[in-house]
Amino acid sequence: MPREKQKRGRRAEDKSKKDAAKRKRDEDPEDLTAKRLKPATEAEVDPNNEITEGADYIPFEENREDGPPSDMPFYGLLDSEEQEYFSRANEVLESNQFQDAEERRIFIDSVYREANGKELKVACSQSCSRLMEKLISLSDMRQIRRLFNKFIGNFLHLVQHRFASHCCETLFMNAAPGVTQKTPKAKEHNMEEGEDDEPEPELSLAEMFMKVVEELEGNWGYLLTERFASHTIRVLLLVLAGEPVDLSSTDSVVASRKKERLGIVTSDAKEEKPVAERQPIPESFEATLKKIMRDMVSGLDNTYLRALATHPVGNPVLQVLVYLELSHFGKSSAKDPNSIIRRLIPDDEFDENSEGATFVRGLLYDPVGSRLLETIIRSMPGKLFKGLYKNVIRDRIGSLARNTTAGYVVLRTLERLGKDDLQNAKESITPEIPGLLERSRLVVPKVLIERCLVRGVDTSSLAQALEAAYDKDPVRRLEQILKLDPVPSEEESEEKQKQSGGNQTAAAEKLHSSLLAQTMLTAPGALSGLVYSSLLAQSSDSLLRIAKDPTASRVIQQALTVSTSTSQFRRQFTTRFTGHLTELALDNSGSHVVDALWPATQDLVFIKERMAQELLQDELTLRDSFVGRAVWRNWSMDLYKRRRGEWKAKAKGIDSNNEGQGERPKSRIDLARAKFAAKAAEESKAPVAAKI
């Protein structure tokens, strides 16, 4: 009888133990209270991640004396009736079927009254903490102050809780715009709202934030690497600095994870609290922020501080600290030998065997540490950046661009280079472009083109490299640039949808391909010519397929409206869509292409009239469609039907704001005449100036 095939050795044994432990975790009920991470023993360390000799990593000691007690206080559980009520309230807020803002405000007040005395229970509840986040995001400053006051005295435990920490985050973000407001008198609110007997808190929001700092004081070193508290600490630091807190932005130093946006979509833009712009702060906040930043790192020596750069939880907090130190307190703070940036990088020259050069080289290829290096490069003083670029990055920028992780550091570097250094970097990266395109690493060429346009660097060598990397046939070239698949048969398309229906990797590659093509169109000369010639070579069916593609259609829109688009190209290209306008206008993506045809034919009025007549023939069909009605409105088709003369004036771009007396845009011959007249006027003045 054949024996079962089994793996032998220490790694197989460790793998079986891990699988058993994983099954046990899946079967056990999840503890609702946040637990402190236990330090991994030597037996539990993954053999693939063993700490080799000389590695720039030192594990943090979890059993620190300054850490808070490990037992989490229990605030109680909601009974079944309370859970049912809050679940229904959550559904009502999700549906957002309120007639007006006043009705929604009354409903939120009723939920707050029901939650009175149970706020901590709701915040720590797995099923109801999301409701608390929604309530906070929809609350006014009076309600936020009251809830903030209920949390005071418990923040040390709440920020470490798996669910309550999110509520603290949302509370800090929404309370930030009110830190400079004065405390309203309690009598005034009692007069306004007779039904509400709850007393107003005596503390202002600024004073409440200071209370939070007092509660957390002495535990900063531990909270720095606490898996739940670290997120809240980052938000708190940015609020104290008055910096924008925008979790949805990819460039935000606080957005290191995917965050659900739990706010309710409203039609009134005034109801949304602005958190994406700098906020005014009290004077006391700045001194408090300096003290917090000093206390956070004072207990760590330089070795541990550098090890924090590769810590998955501590690294984002360190990013915020470095960002605030360099941008908020001025780059002159980098000269202080006790500053964070100086403790990480003690020297300016980055010599071969210096501590700073060794530290930076260790971060270049680290998936976690490279994010800190991006923040440092973006914010560091110019003198320090020049030394870093000259001694660490310049000679190896081509090989760094090939790497998946170090490539992002290269992007931040390109953004800071001057014209001469950018020219040299372009020459080093250009030979790597075929390999980057083959592996779909398209961000580096895209950013390189953008920076060359900003600095005025010649892009002809980039155009040659891109042309050599793609097919010589212009039709095939566009398919390669945009990652367009050949048209499959019906059976093949059904099988492909079943197999790769949600392939996010392919969608991301198509997005970056489209962005690269759009960037190429902004560059005058050969770079944009590669895309323009490929678009003109496409058949009508192929253009329709591209126009209906949500990602690729952006390239057509860009080609029709960008400044490098010539009148000759638009005259040839726009006529390719005649006869298919209604089909495109009824498509979600194609309708945007039809909208782009309006500005593209501003100097081609005869083509625009032909297109308008085609749309008019299918008026009923367009009016029955949501996107069709948008196209009808954007093309001013009602004006075309009733007042054809006014429509023609609008089609030519004549501004008729001043009582119908508009100014016609100057044609090419008018511009040439004006230029010749100005030159003649200068020549006539020249002899007079010489005599004087």
UniProtKB/Swiss-Prot annotation:
Q: Which SMART domains match?
A: Pumilio
Basic and acidic residues bias: start-end ranges: 11-27
Outline the Pumilio repeats, range by range.
114-149, 355-390, 391-431, 534-574, 576-613
Q: Which SUPFAM superfamilies match?
A: ARM repeat
Q: Where is the composition biased (Basic residues)?
A: 1-10
Compartments where found: Nucleus, Nucleolus
**One GO MF term attached to the UniProt entry:** RNA binding
Q: Where is this region: Disordered?
A: 1-69, 181-201, 485-508
Gene3D superfamilies attached to this UniProt entry: Leucine-rich Repeat Variant
* Gene Ontology annotations for the cellular component aspect, listed alphabetically: 90S preribosome; nucleolus; preribosome, small subunit precursor
Keyword terms of this UniProt record: Nucleus, Repeat, Ribosome biogenesis, rRNA processing
Which branch of life, at top level?
Eukaryota
A GO biological-process term: endonucleolytic cleavage in 5'-ETS of tricistronic rRNA transcript (SSU-rRNA, 5.8S rRNA, LSU-rRNA)
What InterPro entries does UniProt report for this protein, alphabetically? ARM-like (IPR011989), ARM-type_fold (IPR016024), NOP9 (IPR040000), Pumilio_RNA-bd_rpt (IPR001313)
Q: What does this protein do?
A: RNA-binding nucleolar protein required for pre-rRNA processing. Involved in production of 18S rRNA and assembly of small ribosomal subunit.
Family assignment from sequence similarity: Belongs to the NOP9 family.
Q: What is this protein called?
A: Nucleolar protein 9
- Organism whose genome encodes this protein: Aspergillus clavatus (strain ATCC 1007 / CBS 513.65 / DSM 816 / NCTC 3887 / NRRL 1 / QM 1276 / 107)
What is this organism's lineage? Eukaryota, Fungi, Dikarya, Ascomycota, Pezizomycotina
